[in-house]
């Protein structure tokens, strides 16, 4: 992982906190103070839960299995933002309706942190068929890359320390423990990916959630099938993709549980590839409260699937046990 980038971010956003009030006040749990943190998509909720622990109530807004790009929260969700002490969203134009509702209702003092925007410089944005540059929509899926997930975790740690300085030691300890888990995951990913033939490290997905991951783990994304309007590609575009699959020898075409599409079956059948439809973009595996129902569990599940479909051996990922820093009591809408 690119630890130098993480260190640079740490230095850039590190906050200096000054103890205030009595020792008793500083040691009081944030739960007692009634802190509420609102998040959007489930992977961000999970990362936040690992860093924040029991120092705040954490409430997700975007239901799992929903198209987070177009999801519009009910007006009743405004109350969540009114009561929020911190709001963490992905940003990068992912959850605009949710962001707009938050901005219209949150207290002026409540920070709304766009984690993706804080993690990337504009020059680092990735654009493709699903996320065209001329529409100003960069690919927002940073959380599928463990390196960026750690960046998100560090931003959350720093933000919460600023809001709740009495919890600084807890947030730091949780972050350190999360780094250990993610480092183990990264090692299992690297070992498993090393078993994939180099010629097979090619990704063609329906919804491109892996552009940043591919950059850091030695894969090449040759295309995404879903257009920017989240509709279906035209017959001409499908024909071009079939030719591309034949020319490159892509062994597998990856779909998404959130975006089922018969087009993928057609492309795979006509081009001779295998269609795999079990990847999850932001829908965590398992049920809330289960260990697999976590960002770590999501990464393990997706990359076992990807490794197997591309001709590799996912034994190291299968041996990796997903876990959270502590019990995850966050609210995940279903």
Model-flagged regions — what are they?
Residues 9-11, 19-334:
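Extracytoplasmic metal-acquisition and chelation regions
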